[in-house]
Structures are given as structure tokens and as C-alpha cells.
Amino acid sequence: MRFKELVFLLKIDEEELLEKLYEEGFFNFAIEENKEGDRLLRVYLREGETLPSFLSNWKILDERLTTPKDWMVELEPFEIVEDVVVDPTEKVTRTDKIVVKLSPGVAFGTGLHPTTQMSVFFLKKYLKKGDRVVDVGCGTGILAIVAKKLGASYVMAVDVDEQAVEVAKENVQKNSVDVIVKRSDLLSEVDGVFDLVVSNILAEIHLRLLEDVDRITHERSILILSGIVDTKENMVREKASKKGWNLLERKQEREWVTLVMKRS
């Protein structure tokens, strides 16, 4: 599949950008910093797909036709947290670390973002062998794959975006792990009871998740919420508290916060 890649100078903060992109159901993008320290937004349009409306007045810095492999080619294997390696090259053969192979699908969700890194950090810390885990808003499926490789007995990964679901399925197959991947608007298509719920999405969407998460958890379940901008942390914590969830731990990288919750 070929994409049109458009590059913009990022004019707004990352939180506002993500909200606008997600509101329009747009998930194929990457945020990066160039050598001059400028923040750039790269968006990838499929054939027939239109640009998010708020970008129509932004100046295009660069434009080209590309394939997913083109934008992944510069990524080298890297250790997302201690002993967990993300490998877009499929060249890593070592067996002393957990290795996650990623297919060149969507640009967002390679593991480079601090919200993904913090989520993996807490998965390593709180996931117990034999746990049942659900990854809500799975993107490329990286968190679900890590959970399975950490020893979870059953893992489900869900996302509202059909392309993300297809990419996650491809990555699950590439890693030879048993993970159920399906399209779902948060927990609408999720049944059963889970020991750990991990979700790397926007703060406002966490509020919706908290309305329904009790249905699929028990009194000892762990809830990992990532993708929260620090200015909206209290909003999420207050909602969680009202729903009977207490804070166990938090971690912050730059403006991004990840919370670990347990039932009170």
C-alpha cells in the first residue's frame, strides 16, 4: 500500500494535536524533532483519504509518495525498557531479552513515545504470569504482545480503528503469540474478567473507559492508564477515585503521565 506523506511544522502543543487528530478519526501520523529543534508532524494519507480539516490551512513543508517500509527503514532495534527490545528490522536473534518484532504499518505506536515506554515499564512491574490482560486502544499491538511475552495466559487487544486492528493482527502473527485482536469502541465488544487492563489513549477517553471498566475487572485487578497530559492528570484521578480506583503509582516523562490504579 502506498501513502501520501505530508510534513508540517507543528504549530500547537502535542496534547491539542492528538485531540484534534483523534476527533477526526485519524491515526496515521508521526511527531518528531529535526536537527534544528523544530517539532514536525508527518501524516500519511491512503488513496482517497482526505487531510484532517484543521490541517488545511497549515503550510506543507514536504510531500511525497511512500510505503510503510520507507518510513520504518531508519528505525534500528532499541531497548524500550530494560530487557525489552523493539525490533523493526527482524534482525535481532538474542534470546536473553523480550524481543517485539514490528511490521511497518502505521507510524504511530513503534514504542518510541514515552507513553508506550511507561506502559511497558509498568507491565513488567505489575503483570503476573498467568494473568488475563486486555489492551484497550492497542494501536500496533505492542503492549498486548509484550504482555503475552511476559507470561500472560490470555491477552485481548482492541481498537476502534480498523487499520490499527489489521496492523496489530499482522504484528501478533509476526511475533508468533496468541493474542485476540478485534475492533471495539473501548470495551463495547469485550467480555470476561481481566486481571490487568492497560490503555494508552487520551485523558478524555480514559473517562469513558472508567465508566465501564468495573464490568471486566475484579477487586484485585490492576489498571494502567497512559497517554495522559499532566494538565489533565487530576481529572482522570478524580474520575477513577469516584469509581473506586486508588492510585498505586505514577510515572512522568516530559508532559506525559502514566497512572497505575487498584480497586479501593
UniProtKB/Swiss-Prot annotation:
Its EC number is 2.1.1.-. It is found in: Cytoplasm. It catalyses: L-lysyl-[protein] + 3 S-adenosyl-L-methionine = N(6),N(6),N(6)-trimethyl-L-lysyl-[protein] + 3 S-adenosyl-L-homocysteine + 3 H(+). It comes from the Bacteria. S-adenosyl-L-methionine binds at T116, G137, D159, N200. The keyword rRNA-binding does not apply. It holds the Pfam family PrmA. GO terms for molecular function: protein-lysine N-methyltransferase activity. GO terms for biological process: methylation. Keywords: Cytoplasm, Methyltransferase, S-adenosyl-L-methionine, Transferase. GO terms for cellular component: cytoplasm. The keyword Methyltransferase applies. Disulfide bonds: none annotated. Gene3D superfamilies: Vaccinia Virus protein VP39 (3.40.50.150). Methylates ribosomal protein L11. Belongs to the methyltransferase superfamily. PrmA family. HAMAP family: Methyltr_PrmA. This is Ribosomal protein L11 methyltransferase. It comes from Thermotoga neapolitana (strain ATCC 49049 / DSM 4359 / NBRC 107923 / NS-E). The gene is prmA.
